[in-house]
Amino acid sequence: MIELDRDAMTPMYVQLANVLRDRIRRGEIPVGRRLPSQSELEEETGGVVSRRTIKSALEVLADEGLVQGVQGKGVFVIALPAGGQS
């Protein structure tokens, strides 16, 4: 389950990107593995975020060079965050 704080000053998409980045950093989602789909992430958050919010979080990770979308396949981890696994 992904827990996000609706009342936090940090936008929901940033909170979600942070959670996913941490999972990548810890090796829970290793390089080469597909991230959960948007519908799976929506379910993991208990439906508190929209698909647009999820897409924005994935765009943040893509802009950081951590993930890449593959048409018809999903979004895959392509690199570790700075600092690697902890």
Where do the language-model regions lie?
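Extreme N-terminal segment that seeds HTH/winged-HTH DNA-binding domains in transcriptional regulators
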Residues: 1-52, 56-68, 73, 79-86
